[in-house]
């Protein structure tokens, strides 16, 4: 359950900018993912980056119209959800997606989805991150 966005042809300036913002949001989510931090607070961390670039605010477009991520288990998409109002604290052993899709209405959307698991030392990446818009699969 990972997602990569790539461009057929060459990315224009707006596509490149939004891809880089998406990457910045992913890193902000990872950095906010500390033990005992609530899922709601992690979603808030993604929206702080959006607002820095005059996207959103909140769940408005252009921006991130849905949750930042979800728990991962036997059903792939499951509780808890990385969304405003989910007060579940992160605990050792939890695994969740980090997938803050940015939508630019009538133009395009960009989503990079990776996974984080929580250890006693804090968050660890479970998947290999996309390298760049030109090489999203790190080939």
Regions found by a protein language model. Give the residues of each.
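Active-site neighborhoods and metal-handling regions in enzymes and metal-associated proteins
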Residues: 1-139
């Amino acid at each position: 359950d990972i997602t990569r966005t790539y461009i057929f042809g060459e990315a224009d300036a707006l596509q490149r900018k939004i891809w880089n913002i998406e990457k910045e949001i992913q890193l902000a989510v990872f950095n906010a993912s500390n033990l005992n931090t609530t899922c709601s607070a992690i979603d808030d961390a993604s929206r702080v980056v959006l607002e820095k670039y005059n996207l959103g605010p909140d769940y408005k477009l252009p921006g991130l119209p849905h949750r930042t991520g979800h728990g991962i288990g036997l059903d792939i998409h499951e509780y808890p959800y990385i969304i405003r109002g989910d007060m579940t604290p992160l605990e050792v052993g939890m695994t969740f997606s980090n997938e803050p899709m940015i939508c630019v209405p009538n133009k395009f959307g960009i989503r990079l989805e990776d996974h984080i698991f929580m250890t006693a030392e804090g968050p660890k990446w479970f998947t290999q991150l996309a390298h760049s818009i030109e090489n999203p699969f790190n080939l």
